[in-house]
From Swiss-Prot:
The keyword Cell cycle does not apply. NCBIfam families: homoserO_Ac_trn, PRK00175.1. Its EC number is 2.3.1.31. This is Homoserine O-acetyltransferase. Residues 44-350 form the AB hydrolase-1 domain. It is found in: Cytoplasm. It comes from Geotalea daltonii (strain DSM 22248 / JCM 15807 / FRC-32) (Geobacter daltonii). The keyword Amino-acid biosynthesis applies. The gene is metXA. Belongs to the AB hydrolase superfamily. MetX family. InterPro entries: AB_hydrolase_1 (IPR000073), AB_hydrolase_fold (IPR029058), HAT_MetX-like (IPR008220). GO terms for cellular component: cytoplasm.
Length: 367
């Protein structure tokens, strides 16, 4: 069963949020969706946190004709992993994004114009502090769980370290305590693609720049896949529409990247892409602490980690570093290494590989 037709909601907070940079952002609008019913003692809420280019549209459809359901539709609904007969599931769009929450494409109330590059640099920690405002608004004192993959996993880490008394458990998939130099360098090249697109106009564009963002998305998309998955899907096949010795002829993998890159341009704001890339690069769960050990000393909730064998963006050793530290500190932690050919995106594509473990973990968290 599915959650059916859903509605996006939003709330605007007139209070200012002091950011990690020291700058002030306000008012703040947060777009969110909820699924299921909050129980009488408000103890069954699960916050699902999205990745880089995700949104609050976690599951269901806005109308019958909507082509695709929410981005993790397979795990949310009656009888599914996040059973809406049991849990009240929340997903909000992070600040800095472009799907309803305040970001660089939003109107600055002080100027009446889009923020563009006057928008302050935000961090993952800032995103989570904004989410805490939403949870307060919903009247929830303590979340049953926070669950997310990739940048969503970073948000779950921040909930565990910054709001340790407000979560009962955390499920973290395909993430890292801090992006590596390689991960940062790939985002840097993606930024160059945008900066060198003349239609970007230093962020003051009227129409979303196409070529720079499409190329940047193509670079990012490669990091989400793996050699195994790309070989299986495309191999070295040449596009049937092109002659092999046509200078501009494309391999199937080229055509795929081209299609997905330009399709992305139609749904995502370029400046938001840049701001969230910066937030990813800046991320360090130990920011503000002397060490990872000191950061994880704050953790109180049981934590469950998943890494995927072919993920080369945030490879398993990065997850294992966190697990070792939590074990050293005597914190309750589970770790599962999933054998997968789908690379970083495995957490989105192979939910059946982790569903049984997460279901049991969530039940224990509520025991």
């Amino acid at each position: 069963m599915t959650v059916g037709i859903v509605e996006e909601k939003s709330i605007t907070f007139q209070t200012d949020l002091r950011l990690e940079s020291g700058r002030i952002l306000g008012p703040i609008t947060i777009a969110y969706e909820t699924y299921g019913i909050l129980n009488a003692d408000r103890s069954n809420a699960i916050m699902v946190t999205h990745a880089w280019t995700g949104s609050a549209h976690l599951a269901g459809r806005y109308c019958e004709s909507e082509q695709k359901p929410g981005w993790w539709n397979e795990i949310v609904g009656p009888g599914k992993l996040l059973d809406t007969n049991r849990y009240f599931v929340i997903c909000s769009n992070v600040i800095g994004s472009c799907f309803g929450s305040t970001g660089p494409a939003s109107i600055n109330p002080k100027t009446g114009k889009k923020y563009a590059l006057t928008f302050p640099v935000i961090t993952v920690r800032d995103m989570v502090r904004a989410q805490a405002l939403l949870i307060d608004h919903l009247g929830i004192e303590r979340l049953h769980a926070v669950m997310g993959g990739s940048m969503g996993g970073m948000q779950a880490l921040e909930w565990a370290t910054q709001f340790p008394d407000r979560i009962a458990s955390a499920v973290i998939l395909a993430t890292t305590p801090r992006p590596s130099a390689q991960a940062i360098s790939l985002n840097a090249v993606a930024r160059w693609a945008i900066f060198n697109d003349p239609t970007w106009k230093k962020g003051e564009y009227r129409k979303n720049p196409r070529d720079g963002l499409a190329l940047a998305r193509g670079i990012g998309h490669i990091t989400f896949l793996s050699d195994e998955s790309m070989t299986a899907k495309f191999g070295r096949r040449f596009s049937a529409k092109d002659g092999q010795f046509d200078f501009f002829g494309q391999f199937e993998v080229e055509r795929y990247l081209n299609y997905n890159g330009y399709n992305f341009v139609d749904r995502f704001d370029t400046n938001a892409f840049l701001y969230l890339a910066k937030a990813l690069d800046l991320y360090d769960v130990a920011w503000g602490y002397e060490s990872l050990e000191e950061a994880f000393a704050q953790v109180k909730a049981p934590m469950q980690f998943f890494a995927f064998s072919s993920d080369w963006l945030y490879p398993p050793p990065q997850t294992e570093e966190m697990v070792r530290m939590l074990k050293k500190l005597g914190k309750p932690v589970e770790y599962h290494l999933i054998n997968s050919a789908y690379g970083h995106d495995a957490f989105l594509l192979e939910h059946e590989t982790f569903t049984p473990m997460v279901r049991d973990f969530l039940k224990k968290a509520g025991a």
